[in-house]
Amino acid sequence: MATAQLQRTSMSALVFPNKISTEQQSLVLVKRLLAVSVSCITYLRGIFPECAYGTRYLDDLCVKILREDKNCPGSTQLVKWMLGCYDALQKKYLRMVVLAVYTNPEDPQTISECYQFKFKYTSNGPIMDFISKNQSSESSMSSADTKKASILLIRKIYILMQNLGPLPNDVCLTMKLFYYDEVTPPDYQPPGFKDGDCEGVIFEGEPMYLNVGEVPTPFHTFKVKVTTEKERMENIYSGILSPKQIKTPLQKILMDKDDLEDEQEHYINDDFDIETKMEEQKKKLGSSELGEPNLVCEEDEIMRSKESPELSISHSQVEQLVSKTSELDVSESKTRSGKIFQNKMANGNQQIKSKESRKRSQLESGKTVLHHFDSSSQDSVPKRRKFSEPKEHI
């Protein structure tokens, strides 16, 4: 038991550094927070098969970390995208990463769910913040506080992903990168990305918005937000959010409005009732270990850490992804976290209208139509800003 605990402590230290006193240490933390966040989301949403993940422990929380796997070209492609994000982050160009889920391989602009990761940089470097309503963003935090905030953010992502209704069985991924235009060279593109040609997207169904959290260091700030279909939020209302935190969303998704969206409360608050939810899960599952609900964790499974700037992926692998993105066999009413949902949620492909009729009904009703991820509330007409999209989609 003591050996297992020592092993977990060692693995946790490998994920998040214990000391954040230099810009390089802060950059490492931000990179790893992004990697762990994306890994948690894709794992619990059933995007890739089990073989595409290694295992780590953050204190008592078991997390799955995405890795390259020859049997899962999609995970290799996403790792390649992440390396492109790291390049832009290191140069202090990157402002926001949008990871989007869509169902029609021919129409990546019509999305079903998306996750935003937003970065800010101080004069000394970059920062990732987790700030509660009563906490000042300017308050100094120790390395221990930063690490606690980082782990809390991952816990919140886990709780949210485990309680969202399931995605359709076959989904695809795309990613958009947005920059600080005033410092980013006009011709800059991270490895694996090209200049984007369609900034706006259309959302399937009625969207709901969640501020998940932030994490601070003396050098960077990183925010996590989620937009999903209202129907998938059914379990969230009763299980995680208090009534005062449920807000009526805007019809139009305004993803990034120069930080004004928080003041105008366009998103649901980020104060999840984590302690209550974890206790409920422990009772239901009979688990004696906090933070590991329904996750298969092997003590000896270690993630392969690859920092290679060059990742190869064949054209045939990409074609295979287009035809069949997810190799995971997900049942109609059960998510990877093990939670059972009503068939009306899981059977999304049968219940949702055709793409054209859905778009038509949205336009007629005035509901969610084309929106810009990067529009400013101060501009009457959204300003065209530089952004990138992948050369190859998943």
From Swiss-Prot:
Modified-residue entries (Phosphoserine), positions: 376
Main location: nucleus
Region of interest called Disordered, as start-end residue ranges on this chain: 306-394
Keyword annotations of the record: Chromosome, Differentiation, Meiosis, Nucleus, Oogenesis, Phosphoprotein, Spermatogenesis
Biased composition (Basic and acidic residues): 353-362
Any one GO cellular component localisation term in the record: nucleus
Composition bias type Polar residues, residue spans: 311-325
Post-translational modification: Phosphorylated at Ser-377 in a SPO11-dependent manner.
Motif position, Nuclear localization signal: 383-386
Cellular localisation: Nucleus; Chromosome
Oligomer status and interactors: Interacts with HORMAD2. Interacts with IHO1.
Function per UniProt: Plays a key role in meiotic progression. Regulates 3 different functions during meiosis: ensures that sufficient numbers of processed DNA double-strand breaks (DSBs) are available for successful homology search by increasing the steady-state numbers of single-stranded DSB ends. Promotes synaptonemal-complex formation independently of its role in homology search.
Entries under PANTHER family matching the protein: HORMA DOMAIN-CONTAINING PROTEIN 1
Protein name as annotated: HORMA domain-containing protein 1
Organism the protein comes from: Sus scrofa (Pig)
Record lineage: Eukaryota, Metazoa, Chordata, Craniata, Vertebrata
Gene: HORMAD1
